[in-house]
Structures are given as C-alpha cells and as structure tokens.
C-alpha cells in the first residue's frame, strides 16, 4: 500500500489537506477537508505539473497521459486527473472521499509530484457545451493547490 498527501494553501485563505491511499493495483482513495471556499460545487483535478512557482497557474493542464478530452470521473473518455466536483457546505468547508482507478501513486502514470487543484466554479464534466468544457470542464480559476507527495 502507498500513501500520499497534499497540503493546499492559497492567497485567498483556502486551506486543506488531501490524503491518497493506493492499494496494490487497485483504485486510489482520496480523502480530504478543504475550508475557506464559497458554498456549492468546485472542480477538483489532478494537474500535470508539481510546479507552484507561479501559484496554481504553473501546475499545467489536467493530468492526461492518454490524450483524452475532459469528462466526468465515471466516463470512459476523460482525463486521468478529472475527479469531478467537491461539495462545499454553508460553512465554507468540503469533506469528501473519492475513489478513482486512474490516479495511482506508483508506476508510469503516478500522480506523485503532480498538483491537486481546487477550482472556483463547478466542473461541468465536459457536458456544458462551453468552449472550455472538453478541456477544463469550464471550472474557472484555480483557488487552491498542493503538490502530491509520498507519505510514510
């Protein structure tokens, strides 16, 4: 079993800790709490780069090793990093558990060293008809991010 963690921070006061657990060749379970967000849905994605030299803007596009278009987590045609939305309550906090088979912590498509990003707006899961739907889910700006590292 492999474990990972990402600590999210932002200049807007968004904070959180995300934990990743990967069992052998199975799915990865993502659990976390993020606070300081506007209530509602917020796009949640693994981005290709672990570079935060320019804040969340330098984390690159969604992690997409198979060259697919953006989609929902349950879609066959989706970026590996497309994790859908997290739901933020009236208190500005999201607590969530996501299980996904396309984000391993080892092997050629490992997400270790990449970034996890929370977006300002809901992810339309590639179905919104907007010009950005098939690339970003039209999820808006990047409000918080953290680099995924291995955890002992």
UniProtKB/Swiss-Prot annotation:
GO molecular function: copper ion binding; superoxide dismutase activity
Disulfide-bond pairs as recorded: 56-145
Primary localisation category: cytoplasm
Cofactor(s) the record lists: Cu cation; Zn(2+)
Keywords noted in UniProt: Antioxidant, Copper, Cytoplasm, Disulfide bond, Metal-binding, Oxidoreductase, Zinc
Cofactor note: Binds 1 copper ion per subunit.
Highest taxon in the source lineage: Eukaryota
Known catalytic reactions: 2 superoxide + 2 H(+) = H2O2 + O2
Family annotation (InterPro entries): SOD-like_Cu/Zn_dom_sf, SOD_Cu/Zn_/chaperone, SOD_Cu/Zn_BS, SOD_Cu_Zn_dom
Documented EC number(s): 1.15.1.1
SUPFAM superfamilies: Cu,Zn superoxide dismutase-like
Signal peptide: none
Family stated for the protein in its record: Belongs to the Cu-Zn superoxide dismutase family.
SUBUNIT field: Homodimer.
Function recorded in the entry: Destroys radicals which are normally produced within the cells and which are toxic to biological systems.
Protein's recorded name: Superoxide dismutase [Cu-Zn]
